[in-house]
């Protein structure tokens, strides 16, 4: 995971539910890393491009690609009732920074 790092996710996402408890925060960070690793694999499987190729083509990883990949990991990571609204227990809201 050279390109979609924990730092990149924190830079490009609003992460709600941060904890002052170091142990709880470590668990949150581990979950984010797990999401990022799985998201990178999902992107490659579906569009056949790795992150270096995407960055070469677009100059960055487009927010929609990151958002879709992170959302696709939710069912793999979090247990949820299919009748419930689709949501992370910890909300990741990708956005594009204004320049």
Feature map (PLM): residue ranges:
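Divalent metal-cofactor coordination and adjacent catalytic microenvironments
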Residues: 1-99
């Amino acid at each position: 995971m050279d390109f979609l790092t924990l730092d990149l996710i924190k830079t490009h996402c609003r992460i709600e539910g941060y904890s002052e408890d170091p142990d709880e925060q470590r668990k949150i960070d581990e979950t984010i890393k797990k999401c990022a690793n799985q998201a990178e694999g999902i992107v490659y499987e579906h569009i056949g491009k790795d992150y270096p190729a995407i960055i070469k083509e677009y100059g960055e990883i487009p927010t929609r690609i990151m958002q879709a990949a992170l959302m696709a990991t939710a069912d793999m990571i979090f247990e949820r009732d299919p009748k419930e609204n689709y949501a992370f227990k910890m909300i990741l809201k990708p956005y594009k920074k204004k320049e």
